Design a protein with these regions (language model features):
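Structural alpha/beta surface segment adjacent to cysteine/selenocysteine redox centers
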Residues: 18-128
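C-terminal cap of thioredoxin/glutaredoxin-like
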Residues: 4-5, 11-32, 121-213
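Short, charged/polar micro-motifs that form catalytic or ligand-binding hotspots
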Residues: 10-11, 55
Length: 213
């Protein structure tokens, strides 16, 4: 059986990425290399695509996300605070300044470069979305979760400036389009894109057809 690799474009702002996380961890235990590609949320990466979305779409999105979490048996609550700061009165329009998001993505990119992308998502990424830690940005919450992932927060910050992390994020913003879609989560296996957590079973099917599972 040939060792396989799956690239995953993953945004910390996406609940659907969180819904996929446990399945990625399970797949990584099956001699499959999961290569995490950190990517900014769509409202920052593709603001023109999101600026005119309306309340009908937003309301369905909220319904679907809660249903998906229930279906997978996952604890779920939107991050408090949101990593992305939105303009008052808007649905999906971000402010120009994003200090919290930039700080978080320095940790994400730095952890991925250190070879701990999945571990970071399992601890820090999960904390953002499982409702366990309101005010996740306060105190030692991030430091403690980084430690649980085998990472040192201060060392990662020291080695990963925002300007440095942004270079990787810009490369991944181009890479996801080259791979075949703009949305997350996007899984890529042998240059074939699988968009959305609900395409995970299609990914497994393809890998079995290629005799790598």
């Amino acid at each position: 059986m040939t060792e396989a690799k799956v690239e995953v474009y993953y945004s910390l702002q996406s609940d659907y990425c969180y819904f996929l996380l446990d399945r990625l961890l399970q797949l990584s235990q099956r001699q499959v290399a999961i290569v995490i590609q950190p990517i900014l949320g769509g409202v920052l990466r593709l603001p023109e695509r999101f600026k005119d979305r309306d309340e009908l779409e937003q309301n369905y999105f909220l319904t679907d996300a809660a249903r998906a979490a229930d279906f997978f048996g996952l604890p779920y609550a939107p991050p408090n605070p949101s990593p992305i700061t939105f303009k008052p009165g808007s649905l999906w329009v971000a402010e120009d300044e994003q200090p919290l998001n930039e700080y978080l993505y320095r940790l994400f990119v730095g952890s991925t470069r250190a070879g701990y992308g999945l571990e970071f998502l399992d601890k820090v990424g999960r904390m953002l979305w499982d409702g366990s830690t309101p005010d996740w940005d306060q105190g030692d919450n991030l430091k403690d979760k980084m430690r649980e992932a085998g990472l040192d927060l201060e060392a990662i910050l020291s080695s990963t400036s925002w300007e440095n992390a942004k270079q990787t994020l810009d490369q991944n913003a181009a890479g996801i389009l080259e791979a075949g879609h703009w949305g997350v989560p996007l899984m890529v296996f042998e240059e074939e894109p699988f968009y959305g957590q609900d395409r995970f079973d299609h990914l497994l099917w393809r890998m079995k057809r290629r005799a790598v599972l």
